[in-house]
């Protein structure tokens, strides 16, 4: 039994009242990243321990596991709370992305513990894709390392605007203010090259001893700032998608009987309300929203992030992968785009290759036209390469088999984020963030109807021996 949880339930007046209170708390998704052995898993274990989120049987098991697999001598090895794979415990490292959940009186949290080894950079990118804040751990003895730079760049590339630089293991440098100041200046020098307007904060701490994690450290009187937990509880997260135009990717056509046809999905951005005039892309057909159906009943309006089913006043042809948006918005379909890519496969990405891609519920095919550059993570410079290797990050030009409706990833991660799928093995081999959609298709779309463009793409895909010309360009 978790005595802290039992006390919270008692204070709220019962389980139902406690659950209602939990629903109204804000949620923060964050990840821990940095170089190997910087103490990421230990930090999460310390957060769970000091916020009293560990059940008594877990604590008892942790004592036994610390004796068997622990790396901290007689002390509790808090990293074992997160490192669940047998290989992780044997090697004392994190391999997979581990998710943990906890809450305080002020906020709920979802933590993604990501691996520090370079060969698991792809796992780190997966964990960062859903987070709003990144905790970058730096070993006070080692300072800023290559993997620290790599994870910082990937975090900002994936749209994370809030970075908390946690300078860990301060106990091993005698809680030196000089060491903290030097590392802080080194990181700020590097961070000046990172894209975007970033909110960067620094906290000196010791995850092993608990200094400045959930309570102020008595050993660092020179630091008067907030603890790590206080930063997490008070940071203001402004979701970009709330202020963006309406985007509703259709994931499923719900047809339980002859009297109901609804289009289910998650509202990617903006808001939608009953009576609103909407447009379906790529067909361009317009209709009005008749109902907004949810698990809890009909609603008059819905907001970004909510799972809903839309019922329209007209029966029109809509299928999985189509996109609904406000009728008065002009968003041309494009057939090519420049995409920031994090490559995740042993086989490198090379020009001329074709892959299946998935974006916002739609599956199609894309060809790699060229690689503009690969980013050198050490100094964030760009260099020309012939292919993009495993864990490589670069800007790639893609051409799609059919016109797609895309947003820039920084504006909308749902309609601007895609994955590459190997056509033979069906394995995900890369992640892409749309850098800039190319508008050549806008001209062609004005010359040909949506039906003509779709028919042209269908003929070229299934009957290539006919030699049909691409209506969107000579390809």
Curated annotation (Swiss-Prot):
InterPro entries reported for this sequence: CysN_GTP-bd (IPR041757), CysN_II (IPR044138), CysN_NoDQ_III (IPR044139), G_TR_CS (IPR031157), GTP-eEF1A_C (IPR054696), P-loop_NTPase (IPR027417), Small_GTP-bd (IPR005225), SO4_adenylTrfase_lsu (IPR011779)
CDD domains, alphabetized: CysN_ATPS, CysN_NodQ_II, CysN_NoDQ_III
User: What keywords appear on the UniProt entry?
Assistant: ATP-binding, GTP-binding, Nucleotide-binding, Nucleotidyltransferase, Transferase
Residue segments, region G4:
168-171
Domain tr-type G, residue spans = 25-239
Among PROSITE patterns, the record links this protein to: G_TR_1 (PS00301), G_TR_2 (PS51722)
Pathway given for this chain reads:
Sulfur metabolism; hydrogen sulfide biosynthesis; sulfite from sulfate: step 1/3
Q: This protein's superkingdom?
A: Bacteria
Start and end residues of each stretch annotated as G1: 34-41
**GO biological process, alphabetically ordered:** hydrogen sulfide biosynthetic process; sulfate assimilation
Q: Where is this region: G2?
A: 92-96
Q: What GO molecular functions are on record for this protein? A: ATP binding; GTP binding; GTPase activity; sulfate adenylyltransferase (ATP) activity
Is ATP-binding there in the keyword field? yes
Q: Where is this region: G3?
A: 113-116
Say what the protein does: With CysD forms the ATP sulfurylase (ATPS) that catalyzes the adenylation of sulfate producing adenosine 5'-phosphosulfate (APS) and diphosphate, the first enzymatic step in sulfur assimilation pathway. APS synthesis involves the formation of a high-energy phosphoric-sulfuric acid anhydride bond driven by GTP hydrolysis by CysN coupled to ATP hydrolysis by CysD.
**Family designation:** Belongs to the TRAFAC class translation factor GTPase superfamily. Classic translation factor GTPase family. CysN/NodQ subfamily.
Stored NCBIfam families: CysN, PRK05124.1, small_GTP
Q: What is this protein called?
A: Sulfate adenylyltransferase subunit 1
Source organism: Shigella boydii serotype 18 (strain CDC 3083-94 / BS512)
Gene name on record? cysN
């Amino acid at each position: 039994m978790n005595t802290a949880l039992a006390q919270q339930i008692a204070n709220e007046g019962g389980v139902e009242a406690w659950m209602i209170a939990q629903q109204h708390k804000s949620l923060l998704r964050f990840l821990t990243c940095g170089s190997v052995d910087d103490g990421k898993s230990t930090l999460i274990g310390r957060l769970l321990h000091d916020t009293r989120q560990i059940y008594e049987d877990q604590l008892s098991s942790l004592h036994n596991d610390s004796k068997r697999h622990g790396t901290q001598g007689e002390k509790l090895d808090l990293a074992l709370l997160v490192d669940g794979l047998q290989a992780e415990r044997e090697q004392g490292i994190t391999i997979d992305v581990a998710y943990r959940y906890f809450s305080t009186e002020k906020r709920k949290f979802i933590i993604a513990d990501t691996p520090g080894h370079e060969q698991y950079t792809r796992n780190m990118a997966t964990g960062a894709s859903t987070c709003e804040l990144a905790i970058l751990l730096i070993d006070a003895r080692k300072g800023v390392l290559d993997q620290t730079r790599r994870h910082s760049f990937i975090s900002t590339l994936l749209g994370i605007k809030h970075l908390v630089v946690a300078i860990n293991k301060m106990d091993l440098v005698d809680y030196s203010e000089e060491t903290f100041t030097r590392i802080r200046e080194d990181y700020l020098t590097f961070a000046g090259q990172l894209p975007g307007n970033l909110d960067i904060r620094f906290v000196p701490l010791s995850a092993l001893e608990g200094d400045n994690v959930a309570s102020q450290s008595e050993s660092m009187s020179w630091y008067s700032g907030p603890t790590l937990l206080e930063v997490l509880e008070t940071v203001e997260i402004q979701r970009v998608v709330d202020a963006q135009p309406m985007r509703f990717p259709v994931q499923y056509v719900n047809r339980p009987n002859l009297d109901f046809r609804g289009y289910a999905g998650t509202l990617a951005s903006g808001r939608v309300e009953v009576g609103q005039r909407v447009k379906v892309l790529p067909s361009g057909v317009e209709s009005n929203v008749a109902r907004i159906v949810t698990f809890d009943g009909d609603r008059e309006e819905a907001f970004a992030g909510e799972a809903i089913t839309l019922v329209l006043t007209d029966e029109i042809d809509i299928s999985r992968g189509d996109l609904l948006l406000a009728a008065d918005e002009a968003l041309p379909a494009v057939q090519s785009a420049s995409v920031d890519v994090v490559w995740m496969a042993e086989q490198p990405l090379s020009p001329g290759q074709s892959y299946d891609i998935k974006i916002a519920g739609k599956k199609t095919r894309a060809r790699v036209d060229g690689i503009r550059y690969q980013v050198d993570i050490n100094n964030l410079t760009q260099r020309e390469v012939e292919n993009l290797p495993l864990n490589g990050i670069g800007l790639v030009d893609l051409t799609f088999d059919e016109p797609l409706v895309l947003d820039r990833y920084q504006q909308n991660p749902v309609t601007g984020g895609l994955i590459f799928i190997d056509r033979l093995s069906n394995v995900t081999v890369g992640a892409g963030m749309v850098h800039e959609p190319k508008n050549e298709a806008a001209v062609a779309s004005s010359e040909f109807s949506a039906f003509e463009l779709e028919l042209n793409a269908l003929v070229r895909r299934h009957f290539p021996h006919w030699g049909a010309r691409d209506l969107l360009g000579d390809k």
